[in-house]
Amino acid sequence: MYSTLTGREDELVPLHPDGVLRMYVCGMTPKFHPHIGHARTFVAMDVIRRYLLYRGYRLKHVQNFTDIDDKIIERAQREQRDVESTAREYMQSYLAVMDRLNVQPADAYPTVTGFMERIVEFIAGLVESGHAYAVDTGDVYFDVASFPDYGKLSHRDLNSQLVAARKELEPGKRDPRDFALWKRAREGEPAWPSPWGRGRPGWHIECSAMARETLGDQLDIHGGGADLIFPHHENEIAQSESLTGKEPFVRHWAHSGLVVLGGGEKMAHSLENFTTIDTILERYTPLEVRYFLVATHYRSSLTFTLEGEAGDVRVRGIEDARGALGRLRRAFGEEPLSLDGPLDQAAVDGFNAAMDADFNTPDALAVIFDLAREINRCRDSGAAPAELDRRRRTLVHLLEVLGLDIRAEGPAEQGSIEPYVDLLLEVRRKLRDLKQWALADEIRARLGDLGVTVEDQPGGGSTWRLER
């Protein structure tokens, strides 16, 4: 498993004598309905969790909600209601959407407001040990200079951070890099008691406190989006290792790649360039959306490209996912099948080898599609039913490890054009091998006239999508 901290893949061996993996994932700040960028992270972490359980690991998974935050307060004020009900609504929205995407629930969902006493205790411990300091205003800051390893996760040096952070200091703040652990109360905002006066936590301290309380001083896996590497996760390390004196705070840092728009811009609530999952699910099925998210390696960025005009907007990658799922459904077929029985061990071994290499879902799906083609060959050649069923059973089994159930949304439609397009593309591939370029181009052009866009890939393969 790759870790952002070390920059390499290492064997995943449980840290603790009980053999249970401790996995903490930074959850959502419930300030609005979740968008596809959120789904990217949480589906990726769900695949990691599912695969580890499938491989026999025992695991406890905790994922927080940051239910008090400047942006939630702003949303509540805009909607003219209280902060608590605002956060509660969007937490429920998140859970409902993740359920539709077949994301398994965490073992615990701690909230900032529910762990306030523990957060205050954690801050007090940092102050007592000399790693944090209170100022006259009632704010408390972490003393970055007291932690020599600061920057080791994001691979930044302290001098460059000092230059980047240079600005007018808040009253009493010693260093521009120091970050808030506790913020004094502001009029009209929720606040809690503390030794430094009423206020609320800074952003980073909450996860250190909740992770420690629910999972202990050291974690096997800590997940989140790549945009959290700095400053959030960097600050978590500084806080946690300063308080406990134990290294590493986390052995494997798993960061999912960001969802970027066609122009390369990150999708985010703050940039107001997001598309909610509910909106996407008005056009696509949850299975199609999940496949789209799973098909790219979790550490790679994922391009989200909208096409078409108002009233008929499509997502290219999900259109491709729709076609891929159709091919898998067609291979599975509609014959009755018992899921109890032997599996195709060669396919299982190939799938495991791919996923064992830092959860390489693209390679794992390649194994699954090889299996689908083998099923089609068996069916066409009249292979023994037991042989066909063994492969069909394996297809379902491996897809379910990825949280993909091709039986969940019905069989492929009888009128599907996919087998005919695939056949034409196979003929076109052979023509290209024979350097019959004109005929190959004619097939591509004629398919285009019928609304089928063909894209040639490096290495000689082709993909296609139906323009609706």
Label each PLM-derived region with a short phrase.
Residues L53, D99, V127-E128, A254, ...:
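Alpha-helix C-terminal capping/helix-coil junction sites
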Residues Y57, H131, V452:
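Short phosphate-binding/catalytic loops that engage adenosine nucleotides
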Residues F65-D70, M91-Y94, Q104-I119, T137-S146:
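Short, glycine/charge-rich beta-strand/loop segments that flank catalytic centers
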Residues E265-A268, N273-R468:
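Structural preference for alpha-helix termini/caps and helix-kink/transition segments
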